[in-house]
């Protein structure tokens, strides 16, 4: 499996733990096709330490699996530590590629040894959220724009956490993000500043290729300003 389609309804389920996308991706990318999944192995594959807080981390994973079972997967427990599962159907989603998932998990493990905080669960959630909103129509730029407050309200993450996740995704060259400052339309009406997201790379048949993100962002800015002027009669 080269990528995971994360259900949009799961991404927006802000009542659930922020680790929901991490565990969903880990479940599919590390255990898909196996008859039985081990909670211990899943916990480890998510990047959680099993040395000092094994029982706490595993209990949290079990709880999130239980939450996922409400709407997104069906589970059958063999015993308290192993289960089999099937994915429930869905229509809308955000894609996370295996190479992106592995790069984020590798960075989390490396920075943990350096005692630097790196919230990989929120980073995956923000990435899945942005991807779920990107316009896939060929005639439109494949971008998404929103305020940090909007993303916070829809994911359940704090603005500070989202801002940190965005910085990491930029540093890793997964997303390119530009801020469109407050602007005044032709009717002298001010519009709120937004962040514009574009993919740093595109994927085709498993191969990663550079994306024309600068052009995509410029087209998006023009579309935003054009729409604002039309709505005010400018």
Roles of regions detected by a PLM:
Residues 1-234:
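Electropositive, intrinsically flexible nucleic-acid-contacting patches
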């Amino acid at each position: 499996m080269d990528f995971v389609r994360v259900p949009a309804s799961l991404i927006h389920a802000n009542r659930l733990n922020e680790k929901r996308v991490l565990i969903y991706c880990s479940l599919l990318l590390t255990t898909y096709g196996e008859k039985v999944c081990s909670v211990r192995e899943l916990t480890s594959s998510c990047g959680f330490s099993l040395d000092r807080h094994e029982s706490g981390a595993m209990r949290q994973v079990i709880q999130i699996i239980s939450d996922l079972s409400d709407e997104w997967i069906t589970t059958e427990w063999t015993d308290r530590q192993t289960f089999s599962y099937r994915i429930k159907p869905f229509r809308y989603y955000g894609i996370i590629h295996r190479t992106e998932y592995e790069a984020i998990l590798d960075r989390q493990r490396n920075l943990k040894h350096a005692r630097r905080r790196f919230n990989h669960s929120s980073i995956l959630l923000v990435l899945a959220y942005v991807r779920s909103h990107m316009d896939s129509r060929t005639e439109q730029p494949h971008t998404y724009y929103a305020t940090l407050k909007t993303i916070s309200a829809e994911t359940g993450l704090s603005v500070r956490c989202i801002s940190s996740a965005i910085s990491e995704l930029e540093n890793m060259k997964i997303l390119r993000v530009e801020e469109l400052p407050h602007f005044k339309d032709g009717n002298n009406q001010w519009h709120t500043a937004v962040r514009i997201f574009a993919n740093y790379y595109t994927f085709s048949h498993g191969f990663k290729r550079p994306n024309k993100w600068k052009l995509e962002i410029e087209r998006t800015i023009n579309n935003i300003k054009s729409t604002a002027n039309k709505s005010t009669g400018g």
